[in-house]
Amino acid sequence: MAKEWGYADHNGPDHWHELYPIAKGDNQSPIELHTKDIKHDPSLKPWSASYDPGSAKTILNNGKTCRVVFDDTYDRSMLRGGPLTAPYRLRQFHLHWGSSDDHGSEHSVDGVKYAAELHLVHWNSKYNSFGSALKQPDGVAVIGIFLKIGHEKGEFQLLLDALDKIKTKGKEAPFTNFDPSCLFPACRDYWTYHGSFTTPPCEECIVWLLLKEPVTVSHEQMAKLRGLYSSVENEPPVHLVRNWRPPQPIKGRIVKASFK
């Protein structure tokens, strides 16, 4: 059996290209953002998300992250505007985090790493299926939100309370009536660039919208996330931490800012 990718030394990001060659491609994510090199693009429009809370379906521990899955069979929960030329359907969101509060985000800003990074994954519905969208350079749009330590975020607690039902790898539970826009920061300013999924197969099909303003969560809330296990039930427990990919070479790509 082919070895499964992961985040350990033997199957971690340095090895992903052995099974998924595109992981060494020219448009890989995440990247380090250096704000002095980023230009404001006045043509970038504001973005808007209109999410139907009824489209939230389940929450899942896949051993790599916790993921909330949405019904994307029709245009229910949509992302529009910004750098996008078409509406995109919300498919899922998930998080990346570290073993302590001082790191865990995948993107960094002027050397600053945050405690976690939330990714909301949308696909361009003109391509008819998520699988088809993965083959297009503008097939997927991901909103990235940084989580920093500070005051507790009440809206985030709804998600954390569901984690007790999915402690171990392979567990899934109903998670309904949730509008993830409650997790957005007040400020909608963003950076945008063309990149990839940060997990294998690392397809280069993503228009990234990285929000400038982080949201705050408490130390206790982050600890709850780290209480998940990457091991299955009745196996020796292994904590699910350090599920982030290090920065990839920017290779001449341009990052643009929606703000001055």
Predicted segment positions?
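Alpha-carbonic anhydrase
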Residues: 1-260
